């Protein structure tokens, strides 16, 4: 599951300063991210709050099922010390997104306290930045899944039971029982 988290004032997308943030609404953004992630078979849990505490609570509550986070922290980008700490506690990557180019705006917007806790940052591409963040996270997850074989029980070579003398009877301990093939030399190899 991908978490799509938007901070203060992003509920006003489409109304607030359209010359900076455009005319797309938060519903439009959520729909776009859901469509992008659906193409990879991933679900999206969207959340927006004007409260830093509510955002922290949401991230913590979903930390076990989250596979990635797309986060536009809004003005919390420049003020929150708790948000990057929370992101570092998550076992998944975060992509920080800003609709406008925060580095080309007022000097106080240039520093992101969140960026050091994020895997990447997308700024100044309008709401398309959300699409690119979703695409990147989904591709990362797909690549990881392709590299990671399904978990199978560990296979162990036969071992002598506890207390067996060298050259004595050889068996498998019950917890380590695995199927084996005997080759022409009589050696055992795991299947």
Q: How would you name each of these model-derived features?
A:
Residues 1-2:
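Extreme N-terminal starter segment of soluble prokaryotic enzymes
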Residues 13-27:
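Glycine- and acidic-residue-enriched helix-capping/strand-helix junction motifs
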Residues 54-58, 79:
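Short acidic active-site motifs
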Residues 76, 81-136:
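Flexible, gly/pro- and Lys/Arg-enriched active-site loops
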Residues 123-161, 171-172, 176-191:
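A charged, well-structured terminal subsegment
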């Amino acid at each position: 599951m991908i978490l799509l988290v938007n901070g203060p004032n992003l509920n006003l997308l489409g109304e607030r300063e359209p010359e900076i943030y455009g005319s797309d609404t938060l519903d439009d953004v959520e729909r776009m991210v859901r469509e992008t992630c659906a193409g990879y078979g991933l679900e999206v849990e969207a959340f927006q709050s004007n409260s830093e505490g509510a955002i922290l609570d949401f991230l913590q509550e979903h930390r076990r099922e989250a596979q990635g986070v797309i986060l536009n922290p809004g003005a919390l980008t420049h003020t929150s010390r708790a948000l990057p700490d929370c992101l570092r506690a998550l076992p998944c990557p975060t992509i920080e997104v800003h609709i406008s180019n925060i580095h080309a705006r007022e000097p106080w917007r240039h520093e992101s306290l969140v960026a050091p806790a994020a895997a990447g940052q997308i700024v100044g591409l309008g709401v398309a930045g959300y699409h690119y963040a979703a695409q990147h996270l989904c591709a990362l997850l797909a690549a990881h899944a392709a590299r990671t074989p399904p978990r199978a029980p560990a296979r162990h070579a036969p071992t002598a039971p506890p207390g067996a003398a060298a050259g004595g009877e050889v068996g498998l301990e019950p917890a380590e029982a695995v199927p084996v093939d005997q080759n022409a030399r009589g050696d055992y190899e795991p299947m």
